[in-house]
């Protein structure tokens, strides 16, 4: 059963958003190549400018919970956390089983 992993990221400085988006595109593409059980990665940009919104959301489909742990411990993920840590105002995560998603939503 696939696990869906979400990461929400809000930049401290709006001008940094394009660079962070580009970094995520490049690095998550590499993660997907190095971890075959990462089935898909989608980087989404917020389209409504509200103070309470996050700027970027990453949606990952992972083969199982072991893949989540492998991703969290992966060198690229650890490096991204260091690089973006100072750029983040807020970061949030959420995990659910794919079977719990409502296809009509």
Put a short name on every predicted segment.
Residues 1-55, 63-73, 96-105:
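Short S/T/G/P-rich N-terminal loop/turn motif that feeds into the first structured element of a domain
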Residues 72, 81-84:
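Short, flexible helix/strand-to-coil boundary loops that buttress conserved ligand/catalytic motifs
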Residues 83-91:
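A cross-taxonomic marker for long C-terminal extensions/tails that follow the last structured domain
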């Amino acid at each position: 059963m696939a696990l869906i992993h979400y990461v929400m990221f809000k930049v401290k400085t709006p001008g940094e958003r394009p660079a962070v988006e580009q970094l995520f595109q490049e690095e998550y593409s590499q993660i997907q190549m190095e971890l075959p059980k990462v089935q898909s990665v989608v980087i989404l940009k917020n389209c409504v400018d509200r103070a309470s919104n996050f700027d970027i959301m990453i949606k990952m489909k992972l083969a199982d919970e072991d893949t989540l742990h492998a991703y969290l411990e992966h060198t690229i993920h650890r490096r991204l956390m260091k690089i973006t840590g100072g750029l983040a105002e807020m970061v949030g995560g959420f995990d659910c089983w794919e079977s719990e998603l409502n296809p009509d939503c």
